[in-house]
Amino acid sequence: MNVLFLSYNICILFFVVCTLNFSTKCFSNGLLKNQNILNKSFDSITGRLLNETELEKNKDDNSKSETLLKEEKDEKDDVPTTSNDNLKNAHNNNEISSSTDPTNIINVNDKDNENSVDKKKDKKEKKHKKDKKEKKEKKDKKEKKDKKEKKHKKEKKHKKDKKKKENSEVMSLYKTGQHKPKNATEHGEENLDEEMVSEINNNAQGGLLLSSPYQYREQGGCGIISSVHETSNDTKDNDKENISEDKKEDHQQEEMLKTLDKKERKQKEKEMKEQEKIEKKKKKQEEKEKKKQEKERKKQEKKERKQKEKEMKKQKKIEKERKKKEEKEKKKKKHDKENEETMQQPDQTSEETNNEIMVPLPSPLTDVTTPEEHKEGEHKEEEHKEGEHKEGEHKEEEHKEEEHKKEEHKSKEHKSKGKKDKGKKDKGKHKKAKKEKVKKHVVKNVIEDEDKDGVEIINLEDKEACEEQHITVESRPLSQPQCKLIDEPEQLTLMDKSKVEEKNLSIQEQLIGTIGRVNVVPRRDNHKKKMAKIEEAELQKQKHVDKEEDKKEESKEVQEESKEVQEDEEEVEEDEEEEEEEEEEEEEEEEEEEEEEEEEEEEEEDEDEEDEDDAEEDEDDAEEDEDDAEEDDDEEDDDEEDDDEDEDEDEEDEEEEEEEEEESEKKIKRNLRKNAKI
């Protein structure tokens, strides 16, 4: 591993050095090429400009000379008819023509004045035509120049694109490690460094040309036109040499890359195939191990689930049984309590009936009495309340004593009940006496007692007191003799007026009051009968409710049992399905194993058959040898020559046997390969 790591690091360092050298070399070559291209373009442009300017100057001079000569001729012919201005112009033109071409002057004094006008017209037409031709020629020249420049630009672009593609291909090969530089020897790095230094020193002038315009001008740039012609030839020669060298280098690089690419590709393909095979084997082994682990994990999970489910079911059953027991106990307790209450209710009802007394009515509003009488009434009410409070406490104490006696012994209960009944009768008499006292106080309000059904006139305050003590009051209209109005100052005080106004009642309603039917104490027999009927109805209702609850509970229990049975059946079915799936998987695995065993047996049988064939052949050969030996024994004395022939035959037979054995081994190997592929 250490050796591989070191070799890998060395390759990376070598690749980095090669890329740096190549980049510097490409940069220097690019500078030189750009310099040569600039020189070429400058020379071509300057040469074209010089040639065009010289030609145009020559043409302009010739055209001017011709026009001047013709004008002079025309002026000489038309001297008498022209004006002084024409004479001056002719004189100036003669001076110019004499200064340019004095040899081309022609005397025109021999021509006639009649033909002068026609000639002028012809000359004007010719001038016009010439001007048109010159304009067309100039346009054509410009178009040709533009076309040439466009072609030149396209060629430059095409060359640049080619170089970029080549450089990109080379760099891609460097990145993949498929390309090696030319001078990649033991001392390759030193040689490359020396070459780069020499190229940079030789091309220092080129860098100066690109960097500063003044130096380029001093070396024969665009300062003087004559120096351009001198340097143009040298630059062209250098360009040709550089192009030829570049072509050779490119061709060599392409050949080297092709050879290296083929070898490296083959090696990499082999390595990749080997790695793929190794990875496939590893993946197969990992997959097999994962499958085994998953199967084991699933089996363990199933076992754990089953155990947990069984435990949960047991716990649920235990909890249900506990709940049922608790509910039954609660029901029993409830029934016991209800029975005790029913036994105690008739005693309490009898006590309540005896305790039901007319409500202590306060002083009426319509009572026109002295304040002393009013105080006496209030004092009586207070005494009545205190008496009731004492009686209530006395009842509670007696009730506690009765419960205590019941717990001690049942026989004593009957005696205690008799005593209580006697005490209740005495109390009833005492209460009736108090009622009569209260009625006397109430009778003061009565105007005329015509209603004999126990109807009494009650004030609003009396009505409120009755409602506070839960005594029902029925309102009825008063009879006509009772509706006797009394004057307001005689009946009402200031306090009464304020109460009437607060309750939003009319004075007449307050004066008359309201009639209320107070519940008169019923007879004891009727009350007992009513209470007995009520208790029986309540008991029947409770029984009915209990029956319904029992039915509901039974139905719930039946449903729960049915659900449990269904769940058990579903679980059994699921277990059976899981077992079937496991059996199917095991059967499939067994079938696969059997198929593999059958294939192996077939291979073994083929091998055995081949071995048997070989053994039979050997036996046949042995029998033949024995026969030959017997014949030899019989004929030893007769023919010794036959012995030599038999020996030769034996050798041939042995050779044939060896060949057959080799063929049989080859067949066995082939069959094994085929089976392995299958």
UniProtKB/Swiss-Prot annotation:
Region 15 X 3 AA tandem repeats of K-K-[DEHK], residue ranges: 120-164
The organism of origin for this protein: Plasmodium falciparum (isolate FC27 / Papua New Guinea)
Signal peptide: 1-25
Residue segments, region 9 X 5 AA tandem repeats of [EGK]-E-H-K-[EKS]: 372-416
Basic and acidic residues biased stretches: 56-79, 109-120, 231-329, 371-411, 532-565
Annotated keywords: Malaria, Repeat, Signal
Skewed-composition ranges (Polar residues): 80-107
Stretches for region 5 X 5 AA tandem repeats of K-[GAV]-K-[KH]-[DKEH]: 417-441
Sequence repeat intervals: 120-122, 123-125, 126-128, 129-131, 132-134, 135-137, 138-140, 141-143, 144-146, 147-149, 150-152, 153-155, 156-158, 159-161, 162-164, 372-376, 377-381, 382-386, 387-391, 392-396, 397-401, 402-406, 407-411, 412-416, 417-421, 422-426, 427-431, 432-436, 437-441
Biased composition (Acidic residues): 566-663
Disulfide-bond pairs as recorded: none
Segments of skewed composition (Basic residues): 121-165, 412-443, 667-678
The protein's name in its UniProt record: Glutamic acid-rich protein
Segments of this protein annotated with the region Disordered: 56-194, 225-445, 520-678
